[in-house]
């Protein structure tokens, strides 16, 4: 169920541990976030703070890392929220693939909140995937009125362009970014289908695929997971309603009635983990 990314720019560490993936957030974050005004922007923030945010690395550092990781056969993920960081990620991955072309690399850029048209073209042409968080749409911690105040109306309208990525045949998958947003795929579907920016809303079918198959594909797991087919691992959820037939504004009310992992019914543990940990420590001390 878990796929490990070495959240580091140290390629040798990842390869020495036989990890096929590198990147993510933390050490591979190219910028910060809008709320703290350190998401890197191509133009200044619209509020009184001004400034253009922060790029944590210069272009050469990111390009050198991507080239080394790509030549080592690793899958790369980079965090980019602002448009300046998104462009930097696109330049670096493009440079790596120009240096050493790979047919099925599945490199990705995480978040992709404010992409540029030029960056989208690079992602389309170089088959760079988009692991996004549709839960950021209408997110209570950064509501639209706040984002409009710090970014301006024009950039607000360009945030999280899921439909644009989809129309450019760029693979989009949804994740939670927990604990920042809820790890609830039903909520992800709702936000993608009922996007307040109607021009960026996607169909129920597209949203469901972005929550299931595309996520498995993004981790090279589509032969085992992501859809219900003979021979695959039977991870599945039984829902209270059919998302294809309920009114779109009712998708958010759908509940998971049963969960199966590897074909077996799963029941969440309702017991506190603390007593088990204490028993384990006690038994270890006695030994």
List the predicted regions and their residue ranges:
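Metal-coordinating catalytic core of metallo-dependent amide/deamination hydrolases
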Residues: 1-87, 91, 122, 127-135, ...
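Active-site glycine- and acidic-residue-rich loops that bind
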Residues: 6-11, 108-117
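Short, small/polar residue-rich loop motifs at catalytic or cofactor-binding pockets
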Residues: 21, 221, 252-253
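Residue-level signal for well-ordered, solvent-exposed loop/turn and beta-edge residues enriched
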Residues: 33, 232, 264-266
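His/Asp/Glu-enriched, well-ordered alpha-helical/loop segment
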Residues: 67-76, 84-86, 91-107, 117-121, ...
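P-loop/Walker A phosphate-binding loop and immediately adjacent motor/lid segment at beta-alpha junctions
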Residues: 248-271
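Glycine- and charge-enriched low-complexity intrinsically disordered segments
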Residues: 265-285
């Amino acid at each position: 169920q878990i796929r490990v990314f070495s959240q580091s720019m140290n390629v040798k560490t990842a390869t020495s541990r036989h990890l096929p993936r590198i990147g993510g957030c933390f050490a591979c974050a190219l910028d910060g976030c809008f709320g703290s005004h350190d998401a890197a922007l191509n133009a200044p923030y619209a509020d009184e703070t001004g400034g253009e945010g922060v790029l944590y690395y210069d272009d050469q550092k990111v390009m050198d890392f991507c080239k080394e990781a790509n030549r080592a056969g690793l899958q790369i993920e980079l965090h980019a929220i602002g448009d300046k960081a998104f462009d930097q990620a696109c330049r670096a991955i493009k440079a790596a693939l120009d240096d050493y072309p790979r047919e099925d690399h599945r490199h990705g850029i995480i978040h992709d909140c404010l992409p540029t048209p030029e960056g989208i073209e690079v992602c389309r042409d170089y088959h760079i995937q988009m692991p996004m968080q549709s839960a950021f749409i209408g997110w209570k911690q950064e509501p639209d009125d706040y984002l409009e105040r710090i970014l301006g109306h024009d950039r607000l309208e360009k945030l999280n362009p899921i439909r644009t990525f989809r129309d450019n045949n760029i693979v989009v998958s949804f994740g939670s970014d927990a604990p920042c947003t809820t790890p609830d795929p039903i909520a992800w579907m709702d936000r993608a289908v009922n996007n307040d920016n109607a021009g960026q809303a996607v169909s129920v079918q597209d949203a469901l695929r972005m929550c299931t198959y595309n996520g498995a594909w993004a981790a090279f797991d589509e032969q085992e997971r992501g859809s219900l087919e003979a021979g695959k691992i039977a991870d599945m959820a039984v829902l209270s309603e059919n998302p294809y037939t309920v009114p779109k504004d009712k998708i958010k009310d759908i509940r998971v009635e049963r969960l199966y992992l590897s074909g077996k019914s799963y029941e969440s543990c309702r017991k506190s983990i603390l007593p088990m940990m204490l028993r384990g420590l006690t038994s270890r001390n006695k030994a």
